[in-house]
Regions:
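N-terminal alpha/beta PP-like core and its mobile active-site loop of ThDP/TPP-dependent enzymes
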Residues: 1-346, 357-368
């Protein structure tokens, strides 16, 4: 069976209905096989950057992982901005790039370039992808595509890049002898244990009982684990004011009485006043970007104890000396734990009144006289 046909079959197996790309000599076999399979529709865009942007927008709107198809040379380099965007915003996706015949990319690597625009594109994007690999053995092509698909959503999501030279795409292989990726081969996440997470949740509940001015800061990581449907319950049950991050703006109704917009450089003044005057800041699924918190972490919510929930331990270590609670966990697991077995909650009416005054005095849109 032809390798490019295996790729088309894989896309159908994963129920990927739409992918994005531009055809070129380097990826013609993949385009042809997908078209002949007839399951996945290829949306042809005008630029490879647009293909990678569309790949991530598809996930943002549909919640389904898809792919971008790039050709070799400038076709691959054009896609990099879209890949960096997906990397920064933790959006999963697979970039499948074509390349010159493997003879011209595998051998004589000390040469600046052999072949026609043949070069090591995975090396170029290795720092902005969760996984990047050039396939030089046709029997491993399906394995690498499967691995990229699973890794893209494993732990903190992100893009993966698989480069398949044209002679590998067109190679005929015995499907039974092809390597298959096993879910059991995924690396362990090494997040907090269930016992540790339970203890952290208990600590946060106690902190909420003690707090006079608590605040939830709700990030895009909540959506990435499919937990946005829990937010109405979270806010309403604890009766705690909330802010959202840029990418999470539509997770909660902007007109919710306890949602005070966004904070940061490009946030609303109301949201910034709420943030700076809280005494307990619970951040869930946000990487605490500089554009939101500023350059000086010690100036953020100066009188507040800060709790951060993030699946990426490196993000927690970034400002670990400022955080009182660093919780390395899935946002959904944390929120579900916080909502479980709850009884009475505090009365934060005075704090809510203060927040409402901020909203009144610093409106998102000035009233028309």
């Amino acid at each position: 069976m032809k390798v490019s046909d295996l790729i088309a079959d894989f896309l159908a197996e994963k129920e990927i209905r739409h992918i994005f790309g531009i055809i070129g000599a380097g990826n013609a076999h993949i385009f042809d096989s997908i078209f002949k399979k007839g399951y996945t529709e290829i949306i042809c865009v005008h630029h490879e950057q647009a293909a990678c942007m569309a790949m991530q927008t598809y996930f943002r709107t549909c919640g389904k992982v898809t792919a971008a198809l790039l050709t070799t040379g400038a076709g691959s380099t054009n896609g990099i901005t879209g890949v960096v965007s997906a990397w920064a915003d933790s959006i999963p996706g697979i970039i499948i790039s074509g390349n010159e015949n493997s003879k011209y990319v595998e051998m004589h690597k000390d040469l600046r370039m052999w072949g026609v625009q043949g070069y090591d594109s995975p090396a170029m994007v290795s720092k902005v992808t969760k996984y990047s690999k050039q396939v030089l053995d046709a029997n491993f092509a399906l394995y690498e595509i499967q691995k990229a698909f699973e890794l893209s959503t494993h732990g903190r999501p992100g893009p993966c890049w698989i480069d398949i030279p044209m002679n590998i795409q067109s190679a005929n292989v015995n499907q039974e002898k092809c390597e298959k990726f096993k879910i059991s081969d995924l690396p362990e996440l090494n997040t907090d244990s269930l016992a540790s997470l339970s203890a952290s949740i208990s600590s946060i509940k106690k902190a909420l009982k003690k707090s006079k001015r608590p605040l939830f800061w709700l990030g895009h990581g909540i959506r990435l684990v499919g937990a946005e449907h829990l937010l109405e319950d979270l806010i309403s049950h604890f009766n705690v004011p909330a802010l959202v991050t840029w990418a999470g703006i539509d997770m909660v109704d902007s007109y919710h009485p306890l949602v005070y917009g966004r904070a940061g450089t490009y946030g609303q003044r109301c949201g910034n006043f709420v943030l700076q005057n809280c005494d307990l800041l619970i951040c869930i699924g946000t990487r605490m970007a500089i554009s939101q918190i500023g350059y000086e972490i010690n100036e953020l919510a100066r009188d507040a104890d800060i709790a951060v929930v993030d699946i990426d331990k490196l993000e927690l270590n970034k400002y670990k000396n400022r955080y009182k609670y660093s919780i390395n966990a899935d946002a959904k697991d944390f929120i579900e734990g916080l909502l479980a077995n709850n009884s009475d909650t505090n009365n934060y009416s005075e704090w809510i009144s203060t927040c409402n005054e901020y909203r009144k005095n610093y409106p998102w849109v000035n009233p028309i006289d």
